[in-house]
C-alpha cells in the first residue's frame, strides 16, 4: 500500500464537530503505509486502539489512484484520530503525526472499480448510525481535490 493523501476537514459537519474551520482549497495530510488496514475477502478488518486515550473516527470515501494519478478504485474507509496525542502535540507546537497517522489509523473496506457518481457513505458503531452523508456534500469536489493534488504534489518531470 502506498502513502495515503487525506483531505483535511472536507465536510462542514465534521469541521463544526471538531470546532474547526473549512479551508478555501483542499489541504492534505499524509498517512503512511503502516497506517492502512485492509479488509479480508469477506470485508472484515480490525484494529487495536489504546483504550485509555480519546479516539475519534470519521467515515471516508477512499480513492486508489493509478500511475498517472487517475482514479482506479474506491472503497469506504474509517479515518481514526487519537485526540489525546493530537491535542498534546498541537499544544506543544509539535507535528501531530502521532495523533493522526499511527499504525492502523486508516481502516479500508473492500475495493471496487472507480465510479464518479454521488455516493452515500456512513459509519455505524454497534448498530447505531454515527455518520451519514453523500459525496456531493464534500466542501471540495473530487475534481478540485485532484487538481490541487496534481498541481501541487504531482510528479515533477
Model-derived features: positions:
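Catalytic-core "active-site belt" of small-molecule-metabolizing enzymes
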Residues: 1-156
Amino acid at each position: 500500500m502506498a502513502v495515503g493523501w487525506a483531505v483535511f476537514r472536507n465536510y462542514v459537519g465534521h469541521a463544526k464537530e471538531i470546532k474547526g474551520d473549512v479551508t478555501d482549497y483542499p489541504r492534505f495530510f499524509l498517512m503512511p503505509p503502516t497506517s492502512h488496514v485492509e479488509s479480508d475477502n469477506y470485508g472484515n478488518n480490525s484494529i487495536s486502539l489504546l483504550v485509555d486515550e480519546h479516539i475519534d473516527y470519521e467515515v471516508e470515501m477512499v480513492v486508489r489512484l493509478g500511475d498517472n494519478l487517475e482514479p482506479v478504485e474506491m472503497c469506504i474507509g474509517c479515518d481514526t484520530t487519537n485526540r489525546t496525542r493530537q491535542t498534546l502535540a498541537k499544544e506543544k507546537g509539535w507535528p501531530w503525526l502521532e495523533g493522526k497517522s499511527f499504525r492502523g489509523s486508516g481502516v479500508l473496506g473492500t475495493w471496487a472499480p472507480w465510479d464518479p457518481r454521488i455516493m452515500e457513505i456512513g459509519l455505524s458503531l454497534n448498530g447505531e448510525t454515527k455518520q451519514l452523508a453523500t459525496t456531493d456534500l464534500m466542501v471540495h469536489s473530487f475534481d478540485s481535490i485532484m487538481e490541487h493534488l496534481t498541481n501541487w504534489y504531482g510528479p515533477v518531470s
